[in-house]
């Protein structure tokens, strides 16, 4: 008897939920099957459920409700992605970049493919605490591709925090209390992926280098991966004799797989293109 009552309670709960999501409408009608149908999508809003001792009619969601639920889920997902992008502190100019929008060339094809595979296999990368070191000359696309990875992950609801060592130091100087600084560090540690842009551009004071090391070491201890971009070469990082820098670079090289970026600066290419376009326009050749 108790088992039967429990079964009835579950059925009643299902029926109540369906009724709440899909209440009757004056325009709804009884179809040839004897069930209530939606006046808009023409689908049943009821279902006959055959039990061992009887048949009961229970409310169900029609296609209109299912479609609305799907739209609500899409809206919630979009809001979550937008929130992740706001929290990521990514520069606005990078928030729409994607692997599909990057101009591919002989020089960057391999780098794009590796970064894309890293993003697509991030669950495994996260499990291994495996990061990336994107290194090479100025303007070769390191920051752009790191942001492509970030956007791919955030579109899949993975939290990312991206900043530079220079900005970290600037932010810390602006905090009014030690608690603010601790909360800032915790945000970096909590993110599923942390992107540190332009390592090596920070001032070489003991304080600055200690902060950078603490941030990187915090990621190491939290077991969460990071991506580091730098204009330094592997030789410069491996051969560094300054102990303050050396321990930073050693930790990065321990955690991050290196990908070299070579070729002509993308920024210089873009500047040259803009120059040519303006020349044609101003000379009346456009």
Which residue stretches match the model-derived regions?
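A short, basic N-terminal segment
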Residues: 1-110, 269-286
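Pre-Walker A (pre-P-loop) alpha-helix and adjacent loop at the N terminus of AAA/AAA+ ATPase modules
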Residues: 93, 101-132
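Short glycine-rich substrate-engagement loop in P-loop NTPases that contacts/grips substrate
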Residues: 107-116, 127, 150-190, 203-210
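Walker A/P-loop nucleotide-binding motif
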Residues: 124-146
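Hydrophobic/aromatic beta-strand patches that form the interior of the parallel beta-sheet core
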Residues: 132, 161, 195, 227, ...
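Loop/turn-to-beta-strand initiation segments
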Residues: 158-159, 190-193, 222-228
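Walker B catalytic acidic pair
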Residues: 198-199
């Amino acid at each position: 008897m108790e088992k039967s009552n429990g079964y009835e309670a579950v059925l009643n709960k299902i029926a109540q939920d369906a009724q709440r999501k899909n209440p009757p409408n004056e325009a709804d009608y009884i179809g040839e099957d004897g069930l209530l149908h939606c006046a808009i999508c023409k689908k049943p809003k009821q279902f006959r459920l055959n039990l061992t001792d009887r048949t009961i009619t229970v409310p169900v969601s029609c296609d209109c409700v299912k479609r609305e639920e799907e739209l609500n889920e899409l809206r919630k997902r979009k809001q979550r992605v937008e929130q992740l992008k706001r929290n990521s502190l990514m520069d606005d100019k990078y928030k729409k970049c994607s692997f599909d929008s990057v101009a591919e060339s002989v020089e960057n094809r391999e780098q794009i493919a590796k970064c894309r595979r890293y993003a697509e296999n991030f669950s495994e990368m996260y499990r291994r605490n495996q990061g990336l070191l994107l290194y090479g000359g100025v303007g070769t696309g390191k920051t752009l591709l790191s942001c492509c990875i970030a956007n791919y992950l955030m579109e899949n609801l993975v939290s990312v925090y991206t900043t530079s060592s220079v900005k970290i130091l600037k932010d810390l100087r602006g905090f009014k209390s030690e608690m603010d600084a601790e909360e800032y560090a915790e945000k970096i540690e909590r993110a599923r992926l942390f992107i540190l842009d332009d390592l090596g551009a920070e001032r070489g004071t003991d304080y600055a280098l200690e902060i950078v090391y603490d941030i990187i070491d915090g990621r190491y201890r939290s077991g969460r991966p990071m991506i580091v971009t730098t204009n330094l070469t592997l030789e410069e990082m491996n051969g560094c004799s300054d102990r303050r820098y050396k321990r930073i670079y050693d930790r990065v090289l321990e955690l991050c797989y290196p990908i070299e970026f070579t070729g002509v600066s993308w920024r210089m290419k873009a500047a040259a293109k803009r120059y040519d376009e303006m020349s044609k326009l101003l000379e009346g050749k456009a």
